[in-house]
Amino acid sequence: MKLTFLGANHEVTGSCTMLEAAGQRFLIDYGMEQGKNVYENQPLPVAPGEIDFVLITHAHIDHTGLLPLLAHNGFRGRIYATIPTVELCGIMLRDSAHIQEFEAEWKNRKGKRSGAEPVEPMYTVQDAEAACRLFRGVEYDKRIQLAPGIEARFVDVGHLLGSASIELWITEGSTTTKLVFSGDIGNLEQPIIKDTTHIQQADYVFMESTYGDRNHDPRPDYVAELVKILQRTFDRGGNVVVPSFAVGRTQEMLYFLREIKEKGLVKGHGNFPVYIDSPLATEATRIFRDTDPGCFDAQTRALLEKGIDPINVPGLRISVTSEDSRMINTDRTPKVILSASGMCEAGRIRHHLKHNLWRPECTILFVGFQAVGTLGRTLIEGVNSVKLFGEPIEVKAEICQLTGMSGHADKDGLLRWVNAFTEKPRRVFVIHGEDEVENRFVDTLTEQGFTACAPYNGAQWAIGAEGAVCLQEGTKVRVEQRTGEGANRAATVFQRLVSAGKRLLRVIEHNEGGANKDLAKFADQINALCDKWDR
């Protein structure tokens, strides 16, 4: 058999590995690159129509985001994933397609005056729907035949609802070889979902290394920490605004808030309202509720057996329309507002920041990672004011963060996972980690007696009865090395300008329905700016 490493090698996003075995070609994940692009993903070495099937570890876009493009370009095989992953991909891929269409529309508006050729979105909602029709849901822990000589089993890995490690048995001639793809290995004791299931045997292992060089801080008591924040904020008469990722983190927060409200832990404010103001989060929450209870951890199942919905917060209010969203801030009752996006770069959360950042009685609570350059990161690092919808907004609210809420295993967790094999695999391929992190984790594994390596994008390996042989080294040239430092700096600055333009378009759309006088003034300001810079 032959393996080609196409993405998320010496970087974290864009996961994809192609296998050619037992007369079949298939992919493990087909994700979109996100954030800084250190090593470019390699293109598929064959036409999409020549791919027989795809196996998906979990629903996050960096593992699934190019599936609509695959369908657009002629792939007609099956996409296998756990049943919850199929459900989550149904909403997440459509959401991603809406973003692709929006960005293409923005670029075309921008290029129309200059006579630039129109651009097409990477893929459309129609492509996403076509990809979703190719999904086939499989049960956890059930060994299935994908093709003659190829069998698979999906094992819960505790990263996200539906996440899995994938065991593969590949028989060629008289030899059967077992491969294990870890997927994203989960952190211990996450709410709602099960902890990672360890696998006992494999010949070859392909494992992630996101936190391969460091451990998480000690896990705090999230409920106790959250109670303190709610208590002091509500006592001041303010709101707690939570920028939250729609899938996973929002449901974890609902789990904590249900316990807080049911036990009456916030004194004097027992009936405080909780709002979900994100259409994607609302859909994801519905999927969590409808999922087979067997996917949940023991604590969650125990609640369900008592007739308690673990994420049904008393007083929970779902905001559907834009008007619903706007009305939230007309009510001065102290409340919790869960809204996307988690890094405050887009979505309804920006409206809530506009209405609450300037109020010293309010709190903005961050519960997830904030990337460099995002509004969320800016607020956490400390700033006196920010611009929202063209207005300078003073930052007087309390800014705080619940640390340690990670869905990924840390270094010790990764080592627990790989050391659970009863015999050391013949080789461990380290993937899905930043450049130096992968190298350090390879060193750690080597010190513990494993044979390990970290292939680059484009690397090819053959695996047979005699072992694994590298056929082709991947590309070790970093993107910034190839383009040159000066060009890279220029590209970065221009990308800032492009991002500002996208933000302007969002601001324009958010002002739909405003007073004519205000809209006219806004239009005059934009036209004056364009007249100044049009070349």
Q: Where on the chain are the PLM-derived regions?
A:
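His/Asp/Glu-rich metal-coordinating catalytic cores
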Residues: 1-55, 60, 64, 71-252, ...
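Conserved acidic residues
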Residues: 52, 203, 335, 362, ...
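A polyampholytic, Gly/Pro-enriched intrinsically disordered region
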Residues: 100-105, 292-305, 387, 469-495
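Short, surface-exposed amphipathic charged segments that create phosphate/polyanion-binding patches used
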Residues: 150-154, 287-295, 415, 465-476
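Short, compositionally biased "basic patch" segments
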Residues: 191-206, 293-300, 370-396
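Hard-cation-handling environments
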Residues: 229-375, 386-387, 422, 437-439, ...
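Generic long, charged, amphipathic alpha-helical segments
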Residues: 387-418
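Charged, amphipathic alpha-helical linkers/stalks
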Residues: 458-518
